Amino acid sequence: MKYIIRTIAIILIYGGVATIPSKAQIDEIGFGLGGLSYTGDLVRGYKLLQNKPAGTFFIRHNINDHVSLRYAVTGGILSGGDANNPVDPFAVQRNASFRITIVELSIMMEYHFLDFKSGSALTRFSPYFAGGIALFGMSGSNEKPEPYSSFQPAIPLSLGLKYIVNPKWMVGIEFGIRNLFTDWLDNVSEGDPLKKNYQYGNWYDNDTYYFTGFTLNYAFYRIPCPFPYH
């Protein structure tokens, strides 16, 4: 695990510095507001009402009309507990909960399925898919049941939709999942039932967290009006 974290950190730092666009090459800048939620030992599956406040700031370099590179910082709150919606009868007795702050650095490649930026585009919108690598840190007040790193790698995958408002501004909506290599996001993993106050969990099933939000970005270049709007 330490090797994985070190490798992804090197890619994000050195690879990001080497490929991050200069000021003249930054095509778009923007931010997003939304929520973070998670699934793991305390909460199973995505639940919209479990979302806690989150935000993201990003810059984007457009390689061509369909492919872009996005460099982002995302942060927010994650929480969950057995008391809210116990996953099984044993969870009632366990009565575990957590609340942490997440800060994530990511590099993602976006692919837009429709041509909506070129001068010959026939539409103002496009769905898109994004994937890449990320490194996140987590901080909370709960005592760790056993030592584990507060910095972890992740594989972010997202689906979204963008819409061109005018030649300089674009809005979007995105749903993203972070596939993790750790089962300690909720501070619950394996446990020894012979130990007092043990916290059991499924250590064969890693935790996952999600970002759902709306984005607004500004283009330093002029987005051509789609053909029907000329």
Predicted regions and their residues:
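Gram-negative (and chloroplast) outer-membrane scaffold detector with strong preference
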Residues: 67-141, 212, 218-220
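Repeated loop/turn-to-beta-strand initiation elements of outer-membrane beta-barrel proteins
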Residues: 27, 66-69, 117, 167-171, ...
